């Protein structure tokens, strides 16, 4: 965990980074997400203060279902949100079919790094006692912090990319290149 703590310290992050785990089965040490999240990327911010897992049915954005490995582009093409976004020209079905995708998983967990450190004082949820298999780390940065991340990646020879919409694709792209992807947002 020292590496994640060091990243947060050096960047002077306002919020804890969030560990993202791709799992085949539900963890007994984490609670299932309860509530409504409009899009898959919403879980990243919710994970700042908590530890929980999500299933396919918790992800309410069809494009997020594709990038998070729950559905194929063909499976979501008739969904209302996809039809709306393609009809206004925000994205095409061809673009959706070419988006990076996380490996197919049954469960995606989001865990505040503070919970992994055993700090449990922020937000709700239990402190995570066992170390999960972390696939990705996400954190929210301002422009100065992004500059430091890019500089560090360049100096270390780590591939990095910048992506606009859809932001949910940054996880799959980072996983694929085993590097850093900076998301600029969807709108």
Segment roles from a protein language model:
Residues 2-187:
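Acidic, serine/proline-rich low-complexity intrinsically disordered regions
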């Amino acid at each position: 965990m020292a590496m994640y703590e060091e990243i947060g310290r050096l960047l002077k992050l306002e919020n804890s980074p969030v560990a993202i785990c791709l799992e085949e089965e539900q963890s007994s040490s984490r609670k299932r997400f309860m509530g409504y999240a409009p899009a898959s990327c919403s879980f990243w911010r919710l994970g700042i203060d908590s530890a929980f897992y999500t299933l396919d049915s918790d992800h309410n954005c069809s494009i997020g279902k594709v990038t998070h490995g729950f559905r194929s582009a063909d499976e979501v093409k008739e969904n209302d949100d996809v039809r709306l976004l393609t009809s206004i020209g925000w994205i095409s079905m061809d673009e959706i079919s070419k988006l990076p995708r996380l490996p197919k998983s049954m469960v995606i967990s989001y865990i505040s790094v503070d919970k992994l450190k055993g700090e449990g004082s922020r937000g709700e949820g239990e402190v995570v006692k066992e170390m999960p298999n972390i696939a990705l780390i996400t954190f929210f940065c301002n422009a100065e912090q992004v500059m430091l991340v890019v500089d560090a990646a360049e100096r270390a020879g780590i591939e990095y990319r910048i992506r606009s919409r859809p932001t949910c694709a940054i996880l799959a792209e980072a996983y694929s290149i085993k590097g850093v992807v900076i998301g600029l947002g969807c709108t």
